Amino acid sequence: MRFQDLHPQAGSRRRKRRIGRGIAAGQGASGGFGMRGQKSRSGRPTRPGFEGGQNPLYRRLPKLKHFPLVKRKVYTTINVGRLNTLPANSVVTVQSLLEAGILTTAKYPLKVLGDGELNVKLEVHAAAFSGSARSKIEAAGGVCVETSVAADSE
């Protein structure tokens, strides 16, 4: 094979359409735009989303408000009532809750919520506490220790 033997594959190089250069060219006179009308005029025929005068979809739908936060904090949550099964004076972490079978996953950082009653003194390590959870843990004689989010998610 020599350099002069190289040629493009058949059908790979199509000629550019020469529009409006006489009827023999196949695209003469109206240039493929049909007869009169808005779509045959110069410039963009209609705006994006135009539905022929019908009320368009973007105007039929309500304006959406209250979008969710883009970088919303996602937590693995647990209520203080579930911590009653743990032994007194123990340190509660994500790992200890997984080993005790109280949590099934540690995908997200831990947040302790305040539903239920707590009768056991515990040292709870979590990324976040609700106000009622913090008061219930401290009322039972326990300690709330806020850990960094990165430490919990590892």
Curated annotation (Swiss-Prot):
Keyword Disulfide bond set for record: no
An individual GO BP term: translation
Leader peptide range in chain numbering: none
PROSITE patterns in the record: RIBOSOMAL_L15 (PS00475)
Disulphide bond pairs: none
Domain of life: Bacteria
Gene Ontology cellular component list: cytosolic large ribosomal subunit
GO molecular function annotations of the record: rRNA binding; structural constituent of ribosome
HAMAP family per the UniProt record, alphabetical: Ribosomal_uL15
Family recorded in the similarity comment: Belongs to the universal ribosomal protein uL15 family.
Quaternary context: Part of the 50S ribosomal subunit.
Name of the protein: Large ribosomal subunit protein uL15
Provenance organism: Thermosynechococcus vestitus (strain NIES-2133 / IAM M-273 / BP-1)
